[in-house]
Amino acid sequence: MKTSIMSYVAASALALAAFRSAAGLLDNAWIKGTTDKDPLTYRAGEEIAITLTPMDIDGEVPAGEYALELTRSDDYGNFKTWTEPFTGAPHVYRTSLDKPGFVRLEAYVLGPDGKRVTKKFTGDATTPEGKKAMNAFEKAKKAVFFDGGAGVEVEKLAPYAEPKDFDAFWTRQFARLDKVPVAFLEKVEVPQRNPRTRLYAVSIACAEGIRPVTGYLSIPVAADEGKKFPARLETHGYSGNPGFHMPGGWARETEIVLNINAHGMKLPAFGATDDDLEELRQSIKSNGRSYAFDPVQNADPETAYFNGMVLRVKRALQCLKTLKEWNGKDLYANGGSQGGLQTIWAAGCGEGVTRADSAITWCCDMHSHADRLAKKASSGGWYIPWTEAMGYYDAVNWAKRIPTACRTNITRAGLGDYCCPPMGLAKLWNSIPGSNKSIVWVQGSEHGYVPPQYEGRDFKKGIGK
């Protein structure tokens, strides 16, 4: 999730293409993982068979030189690591789990030196295409690995109890917005590449004491002729060291788009300087911790960093609904990781979102993260320390309040993503009311990595399955 983590997925795909001219034994290689049935349908105590198939090895693997490092873990703190010979042939691992939850299997190829193999870029970096491929390769994970697993009786997974005054708390918070009229504080047209749209840098008034909503608003030129359009809110992933929010190339002539940052930062179009950016970076930290991670700040739901973020999301939707160019019916929200969390907030905050597309949703059932850390069933540092106040921001609790009229899509849930663990995503899915929803579980997918497409990778549940 750190700095442009969502771009790693695209980088991985580009890097794979770059490997095709590789000469090294494993510079093209990756490991495909498949289960003997739909990985979300195992029952307690049932054997789970995961087949690991090495792909795109360039030659024969020398006998006795390489090993496969395997780690089996689960949501309950069970953990085991061992090695087996790596021959390039498929490997079947069998396990089970006696209660609802997920089993995780990690596999890394070790080289003759006993260290994890690191793939090397072997393309031609002297051409523009080659340089682009090399840059993508540098951003991608370079190990030869698999990270995935399977779920057991996932339909039984239920979240930690929500705060008893959840709705009353948010009624009070939203009343703070009601005291401040929806209005642009600043709106400046900025250059962009699509002549059929206009793009504006905007600052929108938020609640008193809260930084404004800032970002970029694109409106189709055809609106000048009286045409009306759907409106979309786009939100961002996490960056503990944010850079300037710059205009992107996403302006579309088919819909209105408001692309906002998490912080209400000053934009370059409004004269933002390096000093302004550094001031923001320092101000969003708390007690030496990156924003939103300070348990002292998070002890009170009103002082939690997420409080202002939620209010900015709701105000952004309110602003979209005031635009004369909006068609008055289609209101969308989308984002990934932290943006996926904000998308769930958007869908559940009462502004009438009609479609929400949330990928690799962060902060689902955060209480279980505390258990995971205590049992050392964790990898990565992306679990916010639990306080009871975090229950007011947990994606699972917001999901319960999504109207059934809203089409809610969890567009990617990685079975190897332990930044946003599968257990939390399953609880999110179970908490969304009704049947107007879908989720795509992706085998072998980490937070910033999706393996190449193969049969047995994707499993869609809900509408359109």
Where do the protein language model's features map onto the residues?
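Hydrolase active-site cap/lid region
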Residues: 269-273, 336, 340-388, 441, ...
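Alpha/beta-hydrolase fold nucleophile elbow
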Residues: 325-336
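Cap/lid segment of the alpha/beta-hydrolase catalytic domain
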Residues: 242-311, 367-375
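Short, compositionally biased P/S/T/A/G/V-rich stretches that sit at domain boundaries
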Residues: 22-41
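The feature captures the conserved acid-bearing segment of alpha/beta-hydrolase catalytic domains
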Residues: 368-432
